């Protein structure tokens, strides 16, 4: 049973909700995270939704976008609410995105040239618009909905991300690189990876010791044998991506454990925007408020406040104020100020929770109108966020730790 703690207490291997799971220093535990490739049907929908968002922001930085995508065999459906001055060729944006992913022939289960693109897009509700942003100064723009958002950071990797999810993403990135370069001529766009690491619990910190299990499942042509596929993936992906120091004789590797994976993408499973929220964030570490990111402009705090919370958490860790950090913020629709801000340090900080909160309040303004300015969220940057995780990657403003004003 979870043991209740305050935000500053130690003894928690994960502490997803501020609770701890009663673990002694020196104990070891296993933790697993997964990632999905660009051609996974849900991730394909995320990319399309964010491509639509970017297309609007390129012409209208103040566009209000909430675009969901559904994918099934031979069909893409866009649905949602968009209020924008932009003139967007939805057919073109969708087809170019699908082509980039790699679905360019019906033999792969989907073809950007022949798929049917359906639209069910309305204007944003005038009631929401009136209560959130109409006739308001930028700094007074309200949250587009109620909700809770979390940001997490850990010092176990240079990226301040959990090693499990970092490695899972890197496996998928390597697969896509080899597919696009034709080294894996037989590979198709759909793939999934999963990494289990053994951790040592040390005074609230989670210290990765070794990789326990690796799972890779990837869509492939019928012209390659499973034996050859497994050998190729082992030699050119697993052994290249996973640092040798984490691999030992007991590490388990499963490559296409189900066998054949010729039928993939939307032909194998229906896809939907926002169904890979753990892949998009921390791989199960920290916590998640439930709101998805893709297809949403900055007024949707599901996205912007989650980015800001990550910025806060990473800044605290990079400043040496704690080794692990979880930040929660909450909002009410139409109100600019967050309702609550909470920080958990898992017992890894020399500061009290009150001191950490004071540092956050002194250094960060978490109103949506300030977040958009500080993180430059009106730019068309979102399609790149929609694969391999929104956090822990260079080139995004929320990954640049802020120098903090701290009273010693």
Curated annotation (Swiss-Prot):
Q: List UniProt keywords, sorted A-Z.
A: ATP-binding, Magnesium, Metal-binding, Nucleotide-binding, One-carbon metabolism, Potassium, Transferase
Residues annotated for K(+) binding in this entry: 68
Q: Which cofactors, if any, are listed as required?
A: Mg(2+); K(+)
Q: Which reaction does it catalyse?
A: L-methionine + ATP + H2O = S-adenosyl-L-methionine + phosphate + diphosphate
Q: Name the source's superkingdom.
A: Eukaryota
Q: State a GO cellular component annotated for this protein.
A: cytosol
Gene Ontology BP annotations: determination of adult lifespan; one-carbon metabolic process; S-adenosylmethionine biosynthetic process
Q: What's the family?
A: Belongs to the AdoMet synthase family.
Report the protein name in the record: S-adenosylmethionine synthase
Native species of this protein?
Drosophila melanogaster
